[in-house]
Amino acid sequence: MDYLDLGPYSSASGTVRLPGSKSISNRVLLLAALAEGDTTITNLLDSDDTRVMLDALGKLGVKLARDGDTCVVTGTRGAFTAKTADLFLGNAGTAVRPLTAALAINGGDYRVHGVPRMHERPIGDLVDGLRQIGAQIDYEQNEGFPPLRIRPATISVDAPIRVRGDVSSQFLTALLMTLPLVKAKDGRSIVEIDGELISKPYIDITIRLMARFGVNVEREGWQRFTVPAGVRYRSPGRIMVEGDASSASYFLAAGALGGGPLRVEGVGRASIQGDVGFAHALMQMGANVTMGDDWIEVRGIGHDHGKLEPIDMDFNLIPDAAMTIAVAALFANGTSTLRNIASWRVKETDRIAAMATELRKVGATVEEGADYLVVTPPAALTPNAAIDTYDDHRMAMCFSLVSLGGVPVRINDPKCVGKTFPDYFDRFAALAKA
């Protein structure tokens, strides 16, 4: 098996310019493809997940011109020209869910599939929502999961669409992004959420980006959303993708554990991403954090004892960045509890089970629940642990931080970081010092 040995390191400092946000990149690509006019996207993330979105849009007849991290997208004015396509979307939830909705109203014959893990990630609540407006979608294998067959259908919105909010916020994102293109009585579509909506900051990203393309969604709390119907997205001309706040979390944690100063550029106070909230969680644990509009800097830990404080927190709003907290908890002077993280179980892998297994390898005592994790750090980290990454980019990036505990660590299958951050380990090694 391919592996990478890291550390032992005793410090980390420097500056890192973040790659573009995955969540923003794939939303902007789809909005630009559906809009009227040409959109120049800058700082577009180059990774597995954005590549599958670009490949899919190309197969659907969208004209794309790429040059480095810039892409010019010629909009289709609301309808893809290709009426048949077989789309392989890897393990990219940010591509599968929104594209499924866009294709369901496009009047064509499409197949949507991915890697085996994607076929274990739920999509039934989105399909149920789309069927409420007339979509013809069939499951090829297991009910509620890809692969999907999408067929031409007569689409109309005659009543509020109900969708569950407690599995993935991407179902709501997919509906919100597609509904402006559908005619509805009263000139508007309404989406109502059953249960608690998780990952609310990701919905905020969706709504803000739709507004950049000229469509304004109104919301009543987080339970009811009103979308103008039968309208066109209009290109904003140019749009810059801000840095990936989830990716920032590893470097910010490294700045705390390795003394810093370590600065990330590309996200800050002005970010539209909820995962900048990671910086506040890190502050709560005692890290010295300062922020500008588009940068965050960490300078070690503010306690004489040099350890982080344990944390007990609800991470429903920032589930991806919370993984970094789970590994940072190895460096706390007590037991930490991560709550309300049930969504981890349906991500790239079952992240609660995977995290518990790998934390134990480095000596932690871990209690795992349906939607929580309790981490008690060891007196000393176990050196030379071989960390399995489960084809999950975030597992690989999180566990690089163990090397800052003065012990070497082995990361198996390090190339899985290609999903969002292909050169992560090069960037990390440039900042970490023995």
Curated annotation (Swiss-Prot):
Which keywords belong to this entry? Amino-acid biosynthesis, Aromatic amino acid biosynthesis, Cytoplasm, Transferase
Keyword DNA damage listed:
no
Cited SUPFAM superfamilies: EPT/RTPC-like (SSF55205)
One Pfam family in the UniProt entry: EPSP_synthase
Where in or outside the cell it occurs: the entry states: Cytoplasm
Catalytic residues in the record: D320
Q: Name one GO molecular function term.
A: 3-phosphoshikimate 1-carboxyvinyltransferase activity
Pathway recorded for this protein: Metabolic intermediate biosynthesis; chorismate biosynthesis; chorismate from D-erythrose 4-phosphate and phosphoenolpyruvate: step 6/7
Record's protein name: 3-phosphoshikimate 1-carboxyvinyltransferase
Q: Gene that codes for this?
A: aroA
